[in-house]
Amino acid sequence: MKKLAVVGAQWGDEGKGKVVNYFSRDFEWIVRFSGGANAGHTIYVGDKKYVNHLLPSINPVIDSKGFLGAGMVIDVGQLIEELKILERDFPGISSRFYLDPEAFIVLPWHKEEDLLLEEMRKVPIGTTGRGIGPAYTDKASREGLKLFVLFDEVLLRERLEAIYHMKKSKYNRDFAVSIEEMLVYLQGLKAELERLSVNFTSAVDMYRVFRSTSVLFEGAQGVLLDLDFGTYPFVTSGACMAHGVSSVGFSTFELDSVYGVLKAYTTRVGAGPFPTEESTEVGGLLRERGKEF
């Protein structure tokens, strides 16, 4: 069965969501393998527009399913809001999404830390402020939370206490959300995920499923924002290229095709090198016509 990866070939915002949405009619599974809510993928159903930051760009009107892999950093509150929007028009669609329990959680502390770090930098990198960098940092430093921790209240409290005190010591300040408030917040999100009937399934189990069916791997951002191959340090913190499918247990050698998406003109969000930047009224016209805001 066919395995296809769709990735951005510029700085993101190339229209990957539309491409994925178009091809989704031919694939049973749409898989996000990296990134977080700093990505924005637009899909259309008829004349109605949906913008997802975390959810894979499945086609709501056919029986395709979505999987969020372990390489992602997930703002669970944002995820639930996206599910609720789709549920209004497509009741029961949440049960067609599957989460890897090994995926990392973006906490409100990460967002606060993101903005704090940007203020401290001599040269700002243009962060989106969504906590992506600090979340990936905690993941690499083994200091954060994965989704499976939500189902163990004792472990959840222990981890939150450890994370909070580590950050308080690091920045010599208290954070806006207390440990108790964070605990209540996360327990509420867990209950909401259960109410929406979202599935939790490991990549090991999903790999067996994916081997025997058609899968479209949906990339986030673009190659020039990739942590290893982008315009460092003005990059994102995750894998933007096809090699990121390894977080779902796949090798690039198992892919039948990799499609790189471009648009006729180039845009980028935030700071960093942009050799073809057009600062005249022509650039303004392109922004206006292309709705690049």
Regions picked out by a protein language model, each given a short descriptive name:
Residues 1-293:
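Non-transmembrane, aqueous-exposed alpha-helical and coiled segments at domain scale
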